Amino acid sequence: RVSIPSVSKEHNRANAIFSRMGYVNFTDDETIWDDNDDDETIWDNSTESTKPSDEFFRVVGGEDAKPGQFPWQVLLNGETEAFCGGSIVNEKWIVTAAHCILPGIKIEVVAGKHNIEKKEDTEQRRNVTQIILHHSYNASFNKYSHDIALLELDKPLSLNSYVTPICIANREYTNIFLKFGAGYVSGWGKLFSQGRTASILQYLRVPLVDRATCLRSTKFTIYNNMFCAGFHEGGRDSCQGDSGGPHVTEVEGTNFLTGIISWGEECAMKGKYGIYTKVSRYVNW
């Protein structure tokens, strides 16, 4: 269950938005996953079941975020280094990409982070006690299909202006919000393909790409649980190390989770796009 923290004005605004749209509450279903979402349908005329190679972890051309600008963003640390991003669902749970989770890995979640090269008063560190991969996720079949996972923290986060859950709408409205056309992605991933990672949290506004254009851009399979976003001319994109981080859509001043950074071919290449997990498929959570 996703609680509505009293400290978060964003969630109150979200309920007001839904009221105007004829929908009063959001994300109050007790189930972890939507059992009706096993659709492996391939977009349009794509027929290959080719898998991207392991190097495609999937913010190039982005801007430095201000402290607290993306308070739902978290950093995932392994035993030796940071490796992925994620989003705060509530005080005890984080959502990220399933492909970030390697067998036996010990994960530390860092919330309230801005500059990863400095110890900051705003940061909160928690260990992960439980990992839940989507029940249809099968890395041996396709590492990026149903690319979504939940992480349970060992103790609750203390919510404040630097550590705040992202709003999650119901399936219908999450899909509608995605189609608004552009969303924000953020992370500490590589600043250019094969380059160095960012010290300060980066963000970028990326346009949604229609299915036909996306299919023409790649030889790899694009399922209905994925969507494409980015720029045809290249130069701006999510990149290695950003995986698991949020794609959010702003609606009347409130930010909603609409995607999860998943994969791509290199980073910011002309004619190539970032591929994201479509959150609307998984919100009965």
Curated annotation (Swiss-Prot):
Active site: 99 (charge relay system), 147 (charge relay system), 243 (charge relay system)
Subcellular location(s) of the protein: Secreted
Highest rank taxon of the organism: Eukaryota
Listed SUPFAM superfamilies: Trypsin-like serine proteases
GO biological process: blood coagulation; proteolysis; zymogen activation
Record site: Cleavage: 13-14, 58-59
Pfam family, one: Trypsin
Modified residues (Phosphothreonine): 27
Name of the top EC class for this enzyme: hydrolase
Glycosylation sites: 25, 27, 45, 47, 127, 138
Subunit structure: Heterodimer of a light chain and a heavy chain; disulfide-linked. Interacts (inactive and activated) with F11 (activated) in calcium-dependent manner. Interacts with SERPINC1.
Protein name (record): Coagulation factor IX
Source organism per UniProt: Cavia porcellus
Taxonomic path: Eukaryota, Metazoa, Chordata, Craniata, Vertebrata
Name of the coding gene: F9
